[in-house]
């Protein structure tokens, strides 16, 4: 059994035997989600193995950035372990404890995670934590409408275009729920990156110069914009919609496809949020572009604060929290300590390929694993919000009929100025 009793000499998950940190209380700051509530409900297991007590603070996502930032500013060790969005990591890196030496000592291999998840918990070559909540992209589609019109699940973006045109003309609803809107969250880059990377282009080159203006990069961008401006397959409001608007559009039956995070699945057949029933909602891995699929992924790592006075005890907690068996059980068991929990989020590759995990979750992890085979993250630099906003604005303007190439070249010039000022060249 993977759960050894504390009387055994050898504990699971590379935990130290003999309870060297018994009596320590760790303060954990985490985002509000059933996945992490379930971890808290299981923490007696950790306490029985180590004698370490856990004190959890769960903060809603909208308030999380401010809360985590204040932990870094206070610098008083009030929280031993913090949970944050990967793109905030670079600005926190100076007060997060690198874990590479511990990983090596305890024989833990970060290759247990998909590449994008692994990268999301790193900064400048150092590992700062474990990606314990992470989201791949999937293409959700209306199974009933695809069946009705003899359409197959889209394997590439040409399939998306032809299915979108068929459904728009026959059903009078949007083929694809598009989100080209720009509101400061840079969500209109999420699908653009799939096109850019699959074309062999990138955001920056090895010199950190903007690389999206190569001929391949510009063609990929035009093809992404063309979904709306040329092919006309998008639902209403495409040029101003952000991701949430697109999710609502799909859930209300006003568009037949949406490329979005896997966590959206349960909401698409939740009667409080959606007009659709479960048998109308299907999903597939992200479509290929130019014969290749490269997807964007996002994660929420856990890291130890450099200001913690209990770093070794905190590392014991991190080992327990990130162990593959817990990851797996947490997506299978629907009740934890008497509380109903529904969670499909796993981050270990082994969990995504696990038969029981897939059986409990309509095989969504299997589709996610396909999306994640080739995957990447947004650039991990402190200047990314500024550069990303320039790109998001250019893409929004392009979707309204602006000159794609010119807009992207202008964004590149402005971005280069920002990065020059920051000392990259």
Where are these regions (language model features)?
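Conserved C-terminal helix/tail region of periplasmic/extracytoplasmic solute-binding proteins
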Residues: 8-12, 19-25, 53-54, 147, ...
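Short, well-ordered beta-strand elements
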Residues: 22-33, 52-57, 80-81, 176, ...
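Extracytoplasmic/periplasmic solute-binding protein
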Residues: 124-132, 137, 161-210, 255
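Hinge/lid segment of periplasmic solute-binding proteins
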Residues: 7-20, 85-138, 152, 161, ...
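Short, solvent-exposed loop/beta-turn-alpha elements that line the ligand-binding surface or hinge
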Residues: 16-23, 100-115, 180-183, 199-219, ...
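Extracytoplasmic "Venus flytrap"/periplasmic binding protein-like
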Residues: 42-115, 122, 144-155, 248-249, ...
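C-terminal lobe and pocket-closing loops
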Residues: 13, 20, 263-278, 289-393
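Glycine-centered hinge/linker elements that transmit conformational signals in sensory
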Residues: 164-166, 207-238, 282, 286
């Amino acid at each position: 059994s993977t759960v050894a009793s504390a009387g055994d000499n050898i504990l699971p998950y590379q935990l130290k035997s003999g309870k060297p940190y018994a009596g320590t209380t760790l303060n954990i700051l985490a985002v509000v989600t059933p996945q992490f509530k379930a971890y808290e409900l299981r923490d007696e297991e950790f306490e029985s193995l180590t004698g370490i007590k856990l004190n959890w603070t769960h903060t809603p996502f909208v308030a999380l950035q401010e809360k985590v930032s204040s932990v870094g500013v206070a610098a008083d060790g009030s929280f031993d372990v913090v949970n944050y969005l990967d793109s905030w990591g670079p600005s926190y890196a100076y007060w997060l404890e690198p874990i590479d030496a511990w990983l090596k000592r305890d024989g833990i291999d970060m290759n247990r995670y998909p590449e994008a998840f692994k990268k999301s918990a790193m900064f400048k070559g150092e590992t700062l934590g474990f990606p314990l909540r992470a989201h791949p992209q999937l293409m959700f589609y209306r199974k009933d409408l695809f069946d009705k019109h003899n359409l197959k699940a889209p394997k590439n973006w040409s399939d998306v275009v032809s299915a979108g045109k068929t459904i728009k003309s026959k059903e009078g609803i949007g083929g694809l729920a598009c989100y080209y809107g720009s509101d400061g969250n840079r969500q209109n880059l999420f699908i653009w990156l799939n096109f850019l990377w699959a074309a062999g282009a990138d955001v920056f080159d090895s010199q950190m110069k903007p690389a999206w203006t190569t001929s391949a990069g510009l063609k990929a961008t035009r093809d992404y914009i063309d979904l709306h401006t040329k092919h006309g397959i998008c639902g209403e409001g495409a040029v101003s919609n952000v991701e949430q608007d697109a999710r609502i559009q799909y859930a209300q039956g006003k568009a037949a496809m949406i490329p979005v995070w896997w966590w959206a699945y349960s909401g698409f057949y939740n009667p409080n949020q959606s007009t659709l029933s479960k048998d109308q909602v299907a999903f597939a891995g992200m479509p290929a572009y130019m014969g290749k699929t490269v997807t964007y992924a996002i994660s929420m790592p856990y890291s130890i604060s450099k200001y913690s006075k209990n770093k070794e005890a905190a590392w014991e907690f991190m080992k327990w929290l990130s162990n593959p068996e817990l990851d797996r059980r947490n997506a299978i068991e629907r009740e934890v300590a008497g509380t109903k929990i529904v969670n499909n989020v796993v981050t270990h590759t082994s969990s995504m390929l696990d038969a029981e995990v897939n059986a409990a979750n309509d095989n969504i992890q299997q589709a996610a694993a396909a999306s994640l085979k080739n995957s990447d993250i947004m650039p991990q630099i402190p200047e990314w919000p500024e550069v990303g906003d320039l790109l998001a604005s250019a893409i929004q303007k392009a979707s309204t009929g602006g000159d794609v190439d010119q807009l992207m070249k202008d964004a590149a010039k402005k971005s280069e100025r920002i990065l020059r000022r920051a000392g990259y060249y």
